[in-house]
């Protein structure tokens, strides 16, 4: 196979269901055209719909797979993977397609009380990256030569080295840090949109 550049950024966000007893997910399309605040609002809206049962393809897929006898699940999964990933067809009734899992997956395990975690890439998903948020905790850190208490939020990432390497992961970490240190940047439109505005 070969690496094909995506036309858009689709962020998949893991969502707690039924008080944390189950996990589902919501997808945010064209995330590269939104500010962080717009993305957050979309996540809230889609998560509320998923929890109410109005928009939850993930849970429907899990329910469908659960009905298949265990010995045959792997065969069914491999068949779906071949149809969607290798042949490029969509199975709309199940919400499956070559881009079913989006461009990047975000999961907040801190909501389950876990300080830190590391995700494994799911081969059938074609996900190049998974970012895990841990639990925000007070930690002792050094600032201006003094030990002080600060709130620390652990972030870990798992990346597909066929698509990206340590340099790209480092650039992602650099920009996350930059945006967190300069929160006013979160309200800015992406550079691509600014350029389009200037040209128009």
Please identify what each model-predicted range represents.
Residues 1-200:
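C-terminal catalytic/motor cores of large multi-domain enzyme assemblies
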């Amino acid at each position: 196979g070969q690496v094909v550049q995506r036309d858009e950024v689709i962020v998949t966000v893991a969502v707690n269901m039924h008080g944390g007893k189950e996990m589902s997910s919501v997808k945010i399309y064209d995330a590269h055209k939104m500010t962080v605040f717009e993305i957050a609002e979309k996540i809230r809206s889609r998560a509320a719909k998923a929890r109410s049962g109005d928009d939850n393809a993930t849970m429907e897929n899990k329910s469908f797979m659960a009905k298949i006898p265990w010995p045959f699940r792997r065969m069914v999964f491999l068949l779906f993977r071949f149809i969607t990933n290798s042949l490029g067809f969509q199975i709309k009734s199940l919400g499956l397609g070559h881009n079913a899992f989006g461009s990047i997956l975000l999961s907040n395990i801190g909501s389950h009380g876990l300080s830190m975690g590391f995700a494994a890439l799911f081969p059938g998903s074609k996900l190049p990256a998974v970012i895990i948020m841990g639990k925000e905790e007070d930690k002792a850190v050094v600032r201006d030569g003094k030990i002080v208490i600060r709130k620390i939020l652990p972030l870990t990432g798992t990346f597909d080295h066929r698509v990206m390497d340590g340099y790209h992961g480092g650039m992602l970490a650099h920009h996350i840090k930059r945006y967190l240190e300069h929160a006013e940047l979160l309200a800015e439109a992406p550079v691509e949109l600014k350029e389009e505005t200037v040209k128009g």
